[in-house]
Amino acid sequence: MELLTFRDVTIEFSLEEWEFLNPAQQSLYRKVMLENYRNLVSLGLTVSKPELISRLEQRQEPWNVKRHETIAKPPAMSSHYTEDLLPEQCMQDSFQKVILRRYGSCGLEDLHLRKDGENVGECKDQKEIYNGLNQCLSTLPSKIFPYNKCVKVFSKSSNLNRENIRHTTEKLFKCMQCGKVFKSHSGLSYHKIIHTEEKLCICEECGKTFKWFSYLTKHKRIHTGEKPYKCEECGKAFNWCSSLTKHKRIHTGEKPYKCEECGKAFHWCSPFVRHKKIHTGEKPYTCEDCGRAFNRHSHLTKHKTIHTGKKPYKCKECGKAFNHCSLLTIHERTHTGEKPYKCEECGKAFNSSSILTEHKVIHSGEKPYKCEKCDKVFKRFSYLTKHKRIHTGEKPYKCEECGKAFNWSSILTEHKRIHTGEKPYNCEECGKAFNRCSHLTRHKKIHTAVKRYKCEECGKAFKRCSHLNEHKRVQRGEKSCKYKKCGEAFNHCSNLTT
């Protein structure tokens, strides 16, 4: 067999083939061809410099070099294969065609060539091919043959195509959007759905669409009520495996998510992320109606029901409606008597985690919620929220009957009794009823005859603070009650009616 020449390790392209390569592939081609030539020179296997090398060294296009034979067009490949193939694979395909061109006359199909010489046939042509390729492989950089454990020569392009597809142990298909690489084109096609708005899987129950069939399968459990994942500790079942994994941390006490600012640890990632916003002050969720901002999306969702008045969650026991599912869950525990949240200090149990958190402040004496306007501190976040309305003037609770608005829901509830005539607070002494608890408290002093409010000037005592204030105005000579028609002023507003 003749000595290996540069033509033996040359990959040649026609104009159409060269334009088919992208800039990265063209650059790789230049680099590999120049490196092959240097390797042959170092081995003393070439004398004159080929025209191709001269053109490549001058960074000229190689495709119009005069060639001794016509290069067959590459096997037909669909556009989605060629655009996703990595440069290395294109190089390998071309190199295999060069080998096929030189040794195709042997008439052999699927000839296995291994570096250790196994399975090389007794045929003289086979041995020549093996020796030539073995020598050639030693001069080629590893990037051309990323897998050189098995190199095949094919006499038919169909066999070459099949082999290219079989070599999927290498990740050959690259996503042009994010650069991720896949072993098969089907894997790449499946992945590409992420970058598009296309949603192929539709739920027949509710019409919701999903990108993945596995997501649809999980979603269907909402409709079927299927909960295949059961906790061995407490027997609680879940729709998804991930939910069970998270739940188990309650029993193990594992809290893998720790805040670097305050050291507080959490069972789950989502409350940890929410907690971080307390330190940063970040409030990314803004109400479009009033402009109020929240650090949790769930808080914004709850807040929005104030504007809509919508209460879609109804208790089956008593018919009471709520604007949020979690509030209904907590309410239902009043019927069942369930109190799953227990205080470790005193053993007292509660039906919601938020009430337990607020209760714990009693033991610690901590007042962690501070008003930024007046520096007043509060034990509970709900107290701070209500207090802030004094500064903002916000009155989110509106009466549907008369349109009057209030700072707090409790005041709206009391106000509504004016329209309904409801008086739920009864005096045990005389049976008189009142629509507000504060009115009943004032009334009771009539029976106890306690005069707690004493004038510092004259020592006179009064049952009510308002009576003491009126008394003080008389002493100062103030006449705060003015008649609008004639402008006459009086000490007591009761004098206006006489």
From Swiss-Prot:
Pfam families, A to Z: KRAB (PF01352), zf-C2H2 (PF00096)
The keyword Transcription regulation belongs to this UniProt entry's keyword annotation: yes
Keyword Transcription set for record: yes
GO biological-process terms attached to the record: regulation of DNA-templated transcription
Main location: nucleus
Key words of the record: DNA-binding, Metal-binding, Nucleus, Repeat, Transcription, Transcription regulation, Zinc, Zinc-finger
Entry's family note: Belongs to the krueppel C2H2-type zinc-finger protein family.
PANTHER family referenced in this protein's UniProt entry, alphabetically: IP01015P-RELATED (PTHR24377)
Descriptive protein name: Zinc finger protein 682
Source species of the chain: Homo sapiens
